[in-house]
Amino acid sequence: MAAESPQARRDGPAPILFVGGTGRSGTHVVAKLAARNSNYRLVPVECRFHTDVEGFPGLLAGDVSKRAFLKRMQGFWWRGFQTDRLRGLHRFVPRERFDEALAAFDGRFDEDREDACRRLFLDLLWPVTTEGRSGEASGIVEQSCDVVAQAPTLARLFPEARFVHVARDGRDASASRVSQRRWLVYPRTRKQGLEWWERRIRAIDEGSKAIPEGSFLELGLDDFLTRGARKDSIEELASFAGVGAGMRMRHFMRRRMNPGRANRGRWRRGLEPDAQAKVEREYVEVLERLERDGITCAPILRRAFERERAEGSERAVA
């Protein structure tokens, strides 16, 4: 394994690095990038029991009973069908460990709810730091989309955690979401997709206010795909994570993060020029609202928009 560069943060890796976004925004590929070093291990699925409203947030707010939480843990979060495939903790957590962790949680919860939730999370996920052939790691990278939106809960349970928000052009993210749902459930249309995306961005912005200063980073997926900006982005991510941007991270970025693989500009597919212009007008209105309201990722989104517009103008001239 190549040695890490000497540019790592002085305080070193975080025990927990949460990577989130709106959904369809590049969270998974950035989480994989962050874990491409000897200090972190990637939790290979979105676990979601700590971010869904039926999970830790609702449980600790008193809106969800322990019984209902345990039922969902043993059902959907263990082995759930979503978007044409089975997902859930069963993909990497041995059943014996799962059952033991739930039993321990059940016994602790009534005495100290927050401690029980924290320990359940660690009992289930922390063992990935010692599994595999790469030796023991210092921390985990967890990639459930809502980790930043649910930071009021997670930052309280895990004060040692750091949070990354990956922002993507809302036209691409929302088009991907509409396509993923196959127009069967909301959001079904491009307009609904932008509405869905804007609400998610605002929830992330609100949630991020609960994160301690110095423990939150926002990055643009588009910047990882652009020559020049990609070097700055990987250095920023590595520094924030407390590691060096070593050869494994750089190789992964070169191989897996490019405009083609990221489907940059996918929102144009299947739309006639007039329909594309309509989507663009609606998106500009969304961007202007976000900028007016001081949403912190708005400059990242504006930069991606202007870059895509410039590239479109160049294609038209050519």
Predicted regions and their residues:
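PAPS-dependent sulfotransferases, especially Golgi type II membrane carbohydrate sulfotransferases
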Residues: 1-17, 178-181, 205-209, 218, ...
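P-loop (Walker A) phosphate-binding loop of NTP-binding proteins
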Residues: 21-22
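A conserved segment at the C-terminal end of the G1
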Residues: 28-40
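Proline-centered flexible-loop/turn and helix-kink motifs
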Residues: 38-39, 159, 212, 284
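Conserved catalytic segments around the Walker B and adjacent sensor/switch elements
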Residues: 41-44, 217
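Catalytic beta-strand/loop signature of glycosyltransferases that borders the donor
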Residues: 43-46, 247-249
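PAPS-dependent sulfation machinery
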Residues: 44-140
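PAPS-dependent sulfotransferase catalytic domain
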Residues: 103-109, 113-117, 122, 126-248, ...
